């Protein structure tokens, strides 16, 4: 697990919810938000990042909470 200091490093990385669901890949970072493209387009604040294992970003949100950020 690593701490993220530069959010731009996360572009093209996979994103999973705390319950293990795959949300897709980060396609853009703007300010403190990540745009994720998968089954749905989401714009999720980076404050919901739990950890990054070097290949995937894990969130503190479950799938239902994450879909509230649909764009």
Segments (PLM) and residue ranges:
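Peripheral interaction segments used for macromolecular assembly
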Residues: 1-71
